[in-house]
Amino acid sequence: TNKWKDKIKIDENFVVTNPKEKIIIIYNHGSDGNDVKLKDCFWRSELRNMAQLAGDKINGKEIMVYIHCQGQLEGDLGAKLGKVGMWMKKWEGPYPGTSKMDRRVEGNLEVIKKFVKMGVPKKQIFMSGHSCGGWATLRLTAKYMEEVGGGISLMPACFWNLSKKYKVK
C-alpha cells in the first residue's frame, strides 16, 4: 500500500511539541557520488520503511522521522577533482582536508544537538541511514555514541570504487 505517503510532511521550520514524549529517527540517504555535490537529496524508495514508523508510538512516545538531506555537501577533493577523479588508480591518499563523509557525520551531530536543545532527551534520538547514510550512521555512533540513543544502519556501504580497487568482498 501507499499509506506511508500520507505520513510525509515537509516542514523546514518545524518545532517539536512535547519533546520529552517524542522519539526522533534522523534518516540519512545513500549517495551515488563519492565526494561531490549531488542534485538529489534522497530516493523515495528508501523512505518507505522509515516513513511507515512516523506517528507510531512506543511506550506512549510518538516517533518522528527527520529526513536529513546532505546532497549539497562536498569534500575538499571532490570540489577539486570531480566525481571520479579521486578514485583513479594513481590516487593513493591519505585524504587531504575534510571529506564529504566527515562533513556528513559532523552535520548529523549538529542536527542531534538541535533536537537536544529543543528538549528531546539524547536517549530518544536515533541516527539511521541506508548505504552511505548507513556508513555515516556507523561513523557517528562510533565517534559520538554518548550523544545519541543508538544507530540503525541499513546496508552500510560507500565508495564502491575503493572496495573494488582493494578487492574487498
Which residues does each PLM region occupy?
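N-terminal cap/lid segment of alpha/beta-hydrolase-fold proteins
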Residues: T1-N18
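Alpha/beta-hydrolase fold active-site loops
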Residues: K22-I25, E62, Q124
